[in-house]
């Protein structure tokens, strides 16, 4: 009845995905991203098992429009992870992903994230526990190594061990993580990228679905990686320059639909914003994710400034978004 074969994860199109990013990839950002790309696989922020099982809020809320959508879990207790995976499947998530890549001290203190690379048998046990109770893909996001344990053999031992319990999809951040001495931000920038190691992994494990993450800033770079791998996961660039998503379907996925204009994206966001405001939400909960929409264009500064100065004010409504767009048009005319 349950899907426990190694190819489960190939049921989803993994050509392009947006990385789970704490404080960034919340449900408002994901709705915004989905407007621009129908094909991108979206990920939640990492949610800990403790938050889901014992927290007061509902950490699994999302909009139906966000599909396909994966829940990223942080944890290392197989029983708790299985409970959370089952809840995710019952709520309609399309995938559960285990975080084995975050190097922050807080995450390490909870015994999850990148430090779990040193315990591949435990990761395998966690994957197995989740796969036993769900029929959606269970995947792992990890690094190419940790600290001085950064040999190719270390990575393949990890892959072999976790794969043996049925994990058929790995998202590899092509940097190792330093567990001490670097901040999470520094761990995304200082350890050198080694794309060739991830390419080699795909050559050695052709049956696995392998996506690459780390330092990817354009769809042209994504196309290059896709010559070697099954998928590309983009993080910061997809947030800071979100309009790159508007061409994902056409450039990477073969869509013949017209590329959505920035103006059309803004117009499509207005009903969503209004609905959020009507239930007591604040405008800046949503517009903070839209700040980079005009990245690289004349008017980008005017857009950012107007939203930053006005969206947080009490009573701010959609007129703020409209006026911000007018300021962009004024700058464009001035050019």
Curated annotation (Swiss-Prot):
Principal EC category: oxidoreductase
Alphabetical list of InterPro entries matching this protein: Aldolase_TIM (IPR013785), DUS-like_FMN-bd (IPR035587), DUS_fam (IPR001269), DusA (IPR004653), tRNA_hU_synthase_CS (IPR018517)
Site keyed Interacts with tRNA: positions: 99, 185, 188, 301, 304
Binding-site residues, FMN: 20-22, 72, 141, 173, 213-215, 235-236
Protein name as annotated: tRNA-dihydrouridine(20/20a) synthase
GO molecular function: flavin adenine dinucleotide binding; FMN binding; tRNA binding; tRNA-dihydrouridine20 synthase activity; tRNA-dihydrouridine20a synthase activity
Function: Catalyzes the synthesis of 5,6-dihydrouridine (D), a modified base found in the D-loop of most tRNAs, via the reduction of the C5-C6 double bond in target uridines. Specifically modifies U20 and U20a in tRNAs.
Similarity remark: Belongs to the Dus family. DusA subfamily.
Cofactor: FMN
Active site: 102 (proton donor)
Annotated EC: 1.3.1.-, 1.3.1.91
Matching Pfam families: Dus
Keywords carried by this UniProt record: Flavoprotein, FMN, NADP, Oxidoreductase, RNA-binding, tRNA processing, tRNA-binding
Disulfide-bonded cysteines: none
Catalysed transformations (reactions): 5,6-dihydrouridine(20) in tRNA + NADP(+) = uridine(20) in tRNA + NADPH + H(+); 5,6-dihydrouridine(20) in tRNA + NAD(+) = uridine(20) in tRNA + NADH + H(+); 5,6-dihydrouridine(20a) in tRNA + NADP(+) = uridine(20a) in tRNA + NADPH + H(+); 5,6-dihydrouridine(20a) in tRNA + NAD(+) = uridine(20a) in tRNA + NADH + H(+)
């Amino acid at each position: 009845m349950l899907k426990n074969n190694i190819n489960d994860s190939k049921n989803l199109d993994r050509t392009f995905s947006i990385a789970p990013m704490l404080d960034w990839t919340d449900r408002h950002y994901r709705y915004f991203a989905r407007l621009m790309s129908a094909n991108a696989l979206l990920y939640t922020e990492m949610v800990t098992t403790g938050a889901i099982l014992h927290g007061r809020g509902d950490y699994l809320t999302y909009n139906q429009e966000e599909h396909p959508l994966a829940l990223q879990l942080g944890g290392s207790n197989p029983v708790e992870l299985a409970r959370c995976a089952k809840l995710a499947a019952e709520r309609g998530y399309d995938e559960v992903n285990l975080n084995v890549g975050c190097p922050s001290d807080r995450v390490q203190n909870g015994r999850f994230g990148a430090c779990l690379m040193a315990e591949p048998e435990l990761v395998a046990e966690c994957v197995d526990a989740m796969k036993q109770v769900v029929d959606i893909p269970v995947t792992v996001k990890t690094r190419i190594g940790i600290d001085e344990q950064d040999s190719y053999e270390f990575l393949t031992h990890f892959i072999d061990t976790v794969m043996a319990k049925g994990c058929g999809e790995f998202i590899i951040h092509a940097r190792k993580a330093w567990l001490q001495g670097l901040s999470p931000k520094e761990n995304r920038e200082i350890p050198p990228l080694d794309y060739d190691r991830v390419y080699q992994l795909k050559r050695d494990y052709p049956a696995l679905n392998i996506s690459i993450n780390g330092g990817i800033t354009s769809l042209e770079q994504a196309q290059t990686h896709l010559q070697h791998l099954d998928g590309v996961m983009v993080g910061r660039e997809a947030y800071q320059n979100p309009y790159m998503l508007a061409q994902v379907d056409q450039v990477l996925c073969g869509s013949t639909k017209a590329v959505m204009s920035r103006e059309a994206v803004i117009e499509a966001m207005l009903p969503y914003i209004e609905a959020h405001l009507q239930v007591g939400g604040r405008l800046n909960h949503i517009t903070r994710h839209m700040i980079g929409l005009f990245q690289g264009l004349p008017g980008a500064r005017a857009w950012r400034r107007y939203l930053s100065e006005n969206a947080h004010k009490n009573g701010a409504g959609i007129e703020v978004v409209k006026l911000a767009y007018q300021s962009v048009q004024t700058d464009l005319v001035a050019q």
